């Protein structure tokens, strides 16, 4: 039979527009999984995109109740994983003094971020170092910038984590441009 496709089109929610414009406050919440060793637990479907968003939506409701707009999940062994609907990307100083964009390794129990992958492709072309690295909460606080990257919100700058204000990143506008370019080039 012929393939069937469905398409729905809706305006962006105000939450998305505000996150793009103003950034977000986020809470660090434990995900209940180790960063490594998930191969021993294949029944958990870690990193699989499914229609079961119960944990993610509950985490976002919990964050909203605490005055935060988003969540960054941390593994049970203390590593940064992902957001409920985003990939975590940080900016830090690289080995040669250039800005380096980092994100958690794709072999962690996370969903690979297509927006993050496109961002890294564009950023490398513009001279940024980009890499996958094990990150801990302290790395977020020490970073030159923290973003939650996704195909809908694009790049939401994280300005507060667990009530602690982060330094405004010098490259906030540049990051927004990189993500916009990545989205347009990843067609």
Put a short name on every predicted segment.
Residues 1-187:
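Helix-start/capping segments and mature chain N-termini
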